[in-house]
Amino acid sequence: MANRENPDFLSAGTIKGDKVINTAGEDLGKIEELMIDIQDGRVGYAVLSFGGFLGMGDKLFAIPWQALNLRVHDHAFVLDIPKETLENAKGFDKDHWPLTTREELSRTYTYYGYQPYWQTGVTEQIGLPGETIGSERMVRTESTAGRENPEFLSASTIKGDKVVNRAGEDLGKIEELMIDLQDGRIAYTVLSFGGFLGMGDKLFAIPWKALQLRVHEHKFLLDIPKETLKNAEGFDKDNWPITNREWLSTVYGYYGYQPYWQREKERIENRPGNI
């Protein structure tokens, strides 16, 4: 599994279940789920439960990722939101997940005093070449959130989904998502290909941008040539690579994609008013 001592990147599976504390070190609750913005390839929001804290009962709460900071040695996340704000927050029932669009989520961000991440720059279109962002890029969520056409998908739902190529051949499945803790981006997707192309039991780090959801088929399309996959350097399930941006640059470059932090920098520099 991914190394827990790496403070910059953690797998979604590792984050899920982590404790949440306040700035005074008091236990607040835990992270129940990460909801992924499929178009932007990042954590749209974290789903927290607070147990009986402040009489908040069994409801769940959508919290902006920016409000959480990892305290590495405590294996906990610090939530820097005032008690009163949490007390008056509108939660939701575990059987009724309401936040399925950015419009709905923007109200939650505003309530907690955060600017929605998609308003900080021009959101990049990440469909495949020659395709547009439309119904094929819409997403499904877990059963509790409905499987209509929301814009977010839980990390738990993504994990285990099948991956196919353009010819519709099964390639493998998604094993994990590695999260960049700095901004909640999906640093890379971990795929297994089984016996496809003789790739054995190794795992492979794949840029999120290389995947496109086929919503009605409940699977992801991977648009990378067979030869490229065949020659890719995988890693053993018991020996995950130390993730850093230098290593990620090599991975992204191999598959022909620009690293997400470079795209972000370009968007900021190209905003109107910037010289």
Protein language model annotation of sequence segments:
Residues 1-275:
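Peripheral interaction segments used for macromolecular assembly
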